[in-house]
Design a protein with these regions (language model features):
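Structured adenosyl-cofactor binding patch, chiefly the S-adenosyl-L-methionine
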Residues: 130-167
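A short acidic, often aromatic-flanked loop/helix-cap motif at beta-alpha or helix-coil junctions
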Residues: 86-93, 108-110, 150-151
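Short, electropositive, low-hydrophobicity segments enriched in small/polar residues
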Residues: 27, 31, 127-131, 151
Length: 167
């Protein structure tokens, strides 16, 4: 009799690239957002310094460790990329995803699961101001609804990523 020790089954890699651009929330909310988005299938996280963000010091290394631990916990075969915080203008200028969504408190449709890759832009506490929304529209981001309720940034991040990742 030959036995082989195996670990838990590995989940498949996300079907499409899903980029999360998240306005930096205050306190530990970004830590939670990174963890939940990783579990939901995000492939790339871009922390965004928005007008209403409470920007903290360089915590990208911490977020990378959190993402790596979350990926291991959910048996993901890979870790998402975690960028250094960037201004909204810089972050939007780097997006190459063919599908681009901005989560707004609207009656619009939910984001469909992505086939080719998508980016979702989530605001910080208090949301984006009108000029930031206009900038996102100018970069090809269409409004999308994540449901009828006002969500915390970290919850919106997880829901947006999960819907785009088809989970």
């Amino acid at each position: 009799v030959v036995a082989e020790a195996v670990g838990p089954p590995r989940a498949p890699a996300p079907r499409a690239d899903v980029v999360l651009l998240l306005g930096l929330p205050k306190g530990p909310a970004m830590d939670l957002a990174v963890r939940m988005a990783t579990e939901a299938g995000v492939t790339h996280v871009v922390p965004v310094i928005a007008r209403r963000s409470v920007a903290t010091g360089d915590r990208a290394d911490r977020w990378r460790r959190i993402a790596s631990a979350a990926a291991r916990q959910c048996c993901r075969p890979d870790d998402p990329l975690i960028d250094e915080p960037a201004s909204l203008t810089d972050a939007l200028g780097r997006v190459t995803a063919p599908e681009r969504w901005i989560a707004l408190p609207t009656d619009g449709p939910p984001p469909p699961p992505s086939v080719e890759g998508a980016a979702v832009l989530i605001g910080p506490e208090g949301g984006f101001d009108p000029a930031e929304i206009a900038l996102a529209h100018a970069h090809g981001f269409a409004p999308v609804s994540l449901g009828p309720f006002v969500l915390r940034a970290e919850t919106a991040a997880a829901i947006g990523v999960a819907r785009l990742a088809g989970r």
